[in-house]
Amino acid sequence: LENSTSLLSDPPVAAAVVSHFNDCPDSHTQFCFHGTCRFLVQEDRPACVCHSGYVGARCEHADLLAVVAASQKKQAITALVVVSIVALAVLIITCVLIHCCQVRKHCEWCRALICRHEKPS
């Protein structure tokens, strides 16, 4: 009984540790459509590690959930950029018109647009 417990408590031998994966042979370089080929040693067959957004045994299917999530994020960023540009344009136009009214009183079109409340001199 002592021998069996000592066998269980000994650390595993480093030489017995073998990787489960190897690089795929040249004959399988195109095995995965959207991923990296890895060779399963114990099963003696290739397998794929898919890139983000793809699923399937050979990474042949687009992951629609990943595509939708990425699309929604892009839409939110695009909307934020468009709103920021429009707000900046409105701010610049407002500043130009105020400057025109304050500094250049002789500008007729400016007075007609903004300075209606002022009494003519």
UniProtKB/Swiss-Prot annotation:
Removed propeptide positions: 2-16, 67-121
Alphabetic keyword roster: Cell membrane, Disulfide bond, EGF-like domain, Glycoprotein, Growth factor, Membrane, Mitogen, Secreted, Signal, Transmembrane, Transmembrane helix
Domain EGF-like: 20-60
Positions of transmembrane segments: 76-101
GO biological process: cell surface receptor signaling pathway; epidermal growth factor receptor signaling pathway; positive regulation of cell division; positive regulation of cell population proliferation; positive regulation of epithelial cell proliferation; positive regulation of MAPK cascade; positive regulation of mitotic nuclear division
SUPFAM superfamilies xref list: EGF/Laminin (SSF57196)
Keyword NADP: no
Tissue expression per record: Hypothalamus.
Cysteines paired by S-S bonds: C24-C37, C32-C48, C50-C59
Coiled-coil parts of chain: none
Keyword Secreted among UniProt keywords: yes
Domain of life of the source: Eukaryota
GO CC annotation, single: plasma membrane
GO molecular function: epidermal growth factor receptor binding; growth factor activity
Annotated glycan sites: N3
Signal sequence coordinates: 1
Chain ranges on the Extracellular side, renumbered to this chain: 2-75
Its biological purpose: TGF alpha is a mitogenic polypeptide that is able to bind to the EGF receptor/EGFR and to act synergistically with TGF beta to promote anchorage-independent cell proliferation in soft agar.
Subunit record text: Interacts with the PDZ domains of MAGI3, SDCBP and SNTA1. The interaction with SDCBP, is required for the targeting to the cell surface. In the endoplasmic reticulum, in its immature form (i.e. with a prosegment and lacking full N-glycosylation), interacts with CNIH. In the Golgi apparatus, may form a complex with CNIH and GORASP2. Interacts (via cytoplasmic C-terminal domain) with NKD2.
Name of this chain's protein: Protransforming growth factor alpha
